Amino acid sequence: LSNAISVQDIGLTGQTHADGLAVGRPSGFVGGVMKPFLSGEMTVRDGRLYEYMRDLLQTEDIFLEPSACAAVQGPVMLSEREELREYIRNHGLEEKMGNASHILWATGGSLVPPEVREEYKNTYLE
């Protein structure tokens, strides 16, 4: 769809705690460039950003700012959503998933001041 759709078209406001990632309408140019490489897009609730941040901190001892944790949503959805499991089946990927590695482009976190980290760690949204 590239720039033919906006977040408002699907009932979202565009207001987010992940302000560095907020894009109300995708770029037509970038959409065209990415089309051969992209199988889908997703949205993530702000509350999940903080949940993923706490999970990564607890299990991996890695602190990422909440917006960087949006990258976690894709692999999570692969296991939770039937339409994505169907995509995997339809593309003959079921046998490969056991050896799959999900690489997350997760920048951010090392320069977040300690008091802001604590605020993030104690942020709970719906």
For the regions a language model picked out, list residue spans one by one:
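Glycine-rich phosphate/pyrophosphate-binding loop at beta-loop-alpha junctions
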Residues: 1-36, 86-126
